[in-house]
Amino acid sequence: MSKVLTSLPTGERVGIAFSGGLDTSVAVAWMRDKGAVPCTYTADIGQYDEPDIASVPDRAKTYGAEVARLVDCRAALVEEGLAALTCGAFHIRSGGRAYFNTTPLGRAVTGTLLVRAMLEDDVQIWGDGSTFKGNDIERFYRYGLLANPQLRIYKPWLDADFVTELGGRKEMSEWLVAHDLPYRDSTEKAYSTDANIWGATHEAKTLEHLDTGVETVEPIMGVRFWDPSVEIAPEDVTIGFDQGRPVTINGKEFASAVDLVMEANAVGGRHGMGMSDQIENRIIEAKSRGIYEAPGMALLHAAYERLVNAIHNEDTLAQYHTEGRRLGRLMYEGRWLDPQSLMIRESLQRWVGSAVTGEVTLRLRRGEDYSILDTTGPAFSYHPDKLSMERTEDSAFGPVDRIGQLTMRNLDIADSRAKLEQYAGLGLIGTANPAIGAAQAAATGLIGAMPEGGAQAIASRGEVSADDELLDRAAMESGTD
């Protein structure tokens, strides 16, 4: 049975995620006028686009809200963001710049905590401002039902009566004026902005056109680093981690993780760090474009991954990146609390993050232009003396050891040579006219003639001494692999 209502449930309490903007304000007033009982819930997520979040519930009451609550979600959002940082749960990357999934993080927290707050007031119907074309409608749907299995969903923007009467900003403002309700006649921006303590998303309207660049966006968490008239002095900053968590900035400890993130935002923001322009695949696989800010997360991420690379081996790093990317996509789809996500999170936090302790000092300049000045920690796998070109004592291995290691490589090199000889015989390589077609042929500029027998020559040990021959036979007779 569908959980989504397509008409207003008159006489019932309807919870609305209330931002205080025109859309949600007119929705509350319209629902009250048509006989429903609107109850508003505003999430304090440290949003940088709302300077007076504490006043929002009173605004909701002006429009007819029966209940108007402010729910402090900052601590929970910071904790989920730190988990994402530890796991590298960021799958959207382009040209070396990442989107740090700041909006999906916010939806996981608000979609859960607001519905839990509604339950306390016996509100079993929930609505928000997400549209049917975007990601948020599915994210909120999933998190809402996880928090309250009995939840029903009513979105005014899916109600034909609401859309017919109030289909645009002009109609909404005229409706409020006609009903003697306040309307803040703010200038409509050229794009839409959504923000929380971890970052800001700018999208839609003019930004839907790819010939409109990032420089048309006015940062709300940082500075216009691309503008030469904006003076940005270089700054050195040291980030300290303990078991995968950032704990200090320039040696200073903070009363709460929220305070640390605010300071990271301030430091990264004054250099324009963490701003990226991304084309991404929405949940429904349609492509969209967003311009993102995340100065604090970008700063912490740069320091964290420096330590990760100094501490963990190659296979662990590969798993970290592969599973982190998968976890990022799951979060993007609204599956941050699903079992498969919890499994990946637990693994990465336990086996990758717990070992990450140390400090990284960076020199920040403009945007992503920074240098790493120092990296220290108690348990690095990086040991410069082991690979030094100078004479060292207690070296891990010597020339003879490396000769033996190279000799062991003969087996797989011989196997590769045998395959190349086979491909040459088929006309796949070593010729300008591949027999099976150019689309199936690899680049062959480095490969010349491939006479047979090369593989055997590589794998052969040549003449061996009598002692080595005896050892080989002994190993075979004893069944040793």
UniProtKB/Swiss-Prot annotation:
Subcellular location: Cytoplasm
Pfam families, A to Z: Arginosuc_syn_C (PF20979), Arginosuc_synth (PF00764)
Coiled-coil segments: none
Protein keywords: Amino-acid biosynthesis, Arginine biosynthesis, ATP-binding, Cytoplasm, Ligase, Nucleotide-binding
Residues involved in L-aspartate binding: T131, N135, D136
Binding site for L-citrulline: Y99, N135, R139, S192, T201, E203, E280
Record: residues binding ATP: A17, F18, S19, G20, G21, L22, D23, T24, S25, A43, G129, T131, D136, D194
Chief localisation class: cytoplasm
GO BP annotation list: argininosuccinate metabolic process; L-arginine biosynthetic process; urea cycle
EC identifiers of the protein: 6.3.4.5
UniProt-recorded name of the protein: Argininosuccinate synthase
Biological classification of the source: Bacteria, Bacillati, Actinomycetota, Actinomycetes, Kitasatosporales
The gene coding this protein: argG
